[in-house]
Amino acid sequence: MDDSLDSTAHQDRVLIIEDDERLAHLTREYLEANGFQVELEHDGAHGVERIIEEQPDMVILDLMLPGEDGLSICRRARPHYAGPILMLTARTDDMDQV
């Protein structure tokens, strides 16, 4: 069978949890152009459940979110999710918390 026709080929799945819609969509476009399957979540309150239910290959997580902050999401999701979590922030003072 020709591998180029195999519709079951694995694409790495990325969940972006980011309330800045412009940044989220730019990141999504970049990742999709590089072969990733991307899902977006804009509300921190739904972040933990999405991580646990979807088990993406990687999570990109903003620190400052409405509903629940990124550090809380990370702490609550980590016991149920072993994949990488990349933290985003525009503020340098947030780095001390991470």
Locate each region found by the language model.
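N-terminal/domain-start alpha-helical segments
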Residues: 1-98
